[in-house]
Design a protein with these regions (language model features):
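HotDog/MaoC-like acyl-thioester-processing domains
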Residues: 49-142, 216-219, 223-259
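Residue-level preference for alpha-helix termini and adjacent loops
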Residues: 11-15, 25-28, 43, 48-49, ...
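A short linear-motif detector with a strong N-terminal bias
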Residues: 27-29, 33-37, 48-52, 67-72, ...
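Acidic/His-leaning functional-site neighborhoods
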Residues: 145-223, 227-234
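Catalytic strand-loop segment that frames the active site of acyl-thioester-processing enzymes
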Residues: 1-21, 110-180, 194
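Residue-level recognition of well-ordered secondary-structure positions
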Residues: 1, 26-27, 73, 109, ...
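Solvent-exposed, flexible loop/coil residues
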Residues: 16-20, 30-34, 53-54, 60-62, ...
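Hydrophobic, proline/glycine-rich low-complexity stretches
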Residues: 1-69, 257
């Protein structure tokens, strides 16, 4: 929560241990361990891996303490042909160990540029078609300032990829400096929804989906633009303000009714 900029006043409950409430996007951290990515027999080169999409469905509010079991599966593989990209879609079910309660379903996609081998495209994208963000002005906007130490703070959650902290590694990957974790940017989008649309009630977030477009750098401003589709449904995108580039696109948010 601290890594997403939650602090005082209405957000004290997200950072004060005596009144602690979990944020819904914490489920992404619980489900982040994907051991198959590093198994030699897969032939996957994680150094060339890009984060393509992330999705979250919250079935029950996350407890502030406890143990969970994560059941994962490969949901689909799309090979776009020789010299083109391969996309691997996955799904992780977060289960509370003590009660067997299904807390959340986390999905996502990793993209491997140039890894295609099939003659002709094979496979199909699982799930629904990504949401198209409408043209025109957003119904609601929220601007966050991403702290310069945001990647170091988020790294404490267990994502130790040096791309987000080592300037030399970032330069070798083609970036000016270390970039912010994609899942941290996802978390900022969720936090913007809680602040602007949910009156700080984290329990109202039911579904969240994004497609990653361009990384954002710590120290930049992030503008989240929400477009109302229905009473509790929004399309959204996130923009790095200083460079005026979209960093999260095809965003889709579904809220629960107010209690």
């Amino acid at each position: 929560s601290i890594g997403l900029g939650h602090a005082a006043n209405e957000e004290l409950k997200f950072v004060f241990d005596e009144k602690l409430v979990s944020t819904p996007t914490f489920a992404m951290i619980l489900a982040h361990h994907l051991p198959w990515l590093r198994q030699p027999e897969t032939g996957i080169d994680v150094r060339k891996m890009l984060h393509g999409e992330s999705s979250l469905v919250v079935h029950h509010p996350l407890p502030k303490a406890g143990h969970v079991t994560v059941h994962g599966r490969i949901a689909g593989v799309v090979d776009r042909g020789p010299g083109k990209s391969v996309s691997i879609y996955f799904e992780q079910r977060v289960i509370e160990s003590a009660t067997a309660s299904h807390l959340a379903t986390v999905g996502g996609c990793f993209v491997f540029p140039g890894a295609g081998v099939a003659v002709g495209a094979t496979g199909a994208r699982p799930g629904t078609t990504p949401t198209k963000v409408p043209d025109g002005c957003a119904d609601i906007e929220f601007v966050d300032h991403i702290p310069k130490n945001a990647a170091q703070l988020y790294r404490l959650n267990g994502d130790r990829n040096t791309l987000h902290v080592d300037p030399e590694v970032a330069r070798r990957a083609g970036f000016d400096r270390p970039i912010l974790h994609g899942l941290c940017t996802f978390g900022y989008a969720g936090a913007a929804a809680i602040r602007t649309l949910c009156d700080h009630d984290a329990g109202r977030v039911e579904k969240l989906h994004v497609r990653y477009s361009t990384p954002i750098y710590p120290g930049e401003q992030l503008r989240t633009e929400f477009f109302r589709i229905d009473t509790n449904e929004y399309a959204f995108r996130c923009i790095a303000v200083e460079r005026n580039v979209t960093v999260l696109e095809a965003g889709h948010l579904v809220l629960r009714n107010e209690k």
